[in-house]
């Protein structure tokens, strides 16, 4: 029931009188995502009390809009052509349209945050979106960096991926008036879930299938992204093999 309401609100809150935003926004939001982040928010909101279902749904919409915006921007940066087995928005409408509609979704998300009127939620999401941007820049800085350490890699995936899961779990606790200790525990769950989620994605990029991932295999390799499979391979291979991987 909550997910059905979420889908309805996503459609309503993404609509404008600008046709390109409607077309491109519908494409990214209805592209077959699993809604993992808003689902975590909804579930964590059930652990407390005094839950306002409208606020829960609106907060879940915010999380999904932020996620969709990052996907639009990521696909432009990575020059990706396929996501969830469909053409990416930048492939269909071009980079400019994808970036601008990503900006719209970010700003619409923060419009809704203002309506929710929770300083704690606002602070959490302001920090989260800023950290995501830092993570994306850190990843860009380390393209083809075969000296990237596992520690640095973990920091990158925390900033660009895990922190939104962390925020989702935390916000559910805030909405349902959980104790500070409970909210911290929820945030830790979101953190670890997000790390595991990204580790799995990075593994499947090499050892999965297109039917599982919805995108072409070894995209990370072709984009020069150094992920954990490459880091471990570099640790175990000889100098000749390292040179080959570096190329």
Feature locations, PLM:
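N-terminal amphipathic/basic leader segments beginning at the initiator methionine
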Residues: 1-11
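Mg2+-dependent prenyl diphosphate-binding active-site environment of isoprenoid biosynthetic enzymes
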Residues: 11-242
């Amino acid at each position: 029931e909550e997910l059905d309401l979420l889908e309805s609100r996503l459609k309503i809150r993404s609509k404008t009188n600008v046709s390109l935003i409607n077309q491109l926004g519908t494409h990214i939001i209805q592209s077959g995502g699993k809604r993992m982040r808003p689902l975590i928010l909804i579930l964590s909101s059930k652990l407390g009390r005094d839950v306002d279902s409208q606020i829960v749904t609106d907060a879940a919409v915010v999380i999904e809009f932020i996620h969709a915006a990052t996907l639009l921007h990521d696909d432009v940066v990575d020059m990706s052509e396929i996501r969830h087995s469909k053409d990416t928005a930048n492939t269909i409408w071009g980079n400019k349209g994808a970036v601008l509609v990503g900006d719209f979704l970010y700003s619409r998300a923060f419009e809704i945050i203002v309506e929710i009127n929770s300083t704690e939620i606002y602070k959490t999401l302001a920090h989260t979106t800023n950290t995501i941007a830092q993570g994306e820049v850190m990843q860009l800085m380390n393209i083809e960096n075969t000296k990237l350490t596992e520690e640095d890699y973990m920091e990158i995936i925390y900033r660009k991926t895990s922190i939104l899961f962390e925020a989702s779990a935390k916000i559910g606790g805030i909405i349902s008036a959980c104790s500070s200790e409970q909210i911290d525990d929820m945030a830790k769950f979101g953190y670890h879930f997000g790390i595991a989620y990204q580790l799995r994605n990075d593994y499947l990029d090499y050892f999965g299938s297109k039917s599982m991932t919805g995108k072409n295999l070894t995209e990370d390799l072709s984009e020069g992204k150094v992920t954990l499979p490459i880091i471990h391979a570099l640790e175990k291979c000889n100098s000749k093999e390292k040179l080959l991987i570096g190329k």
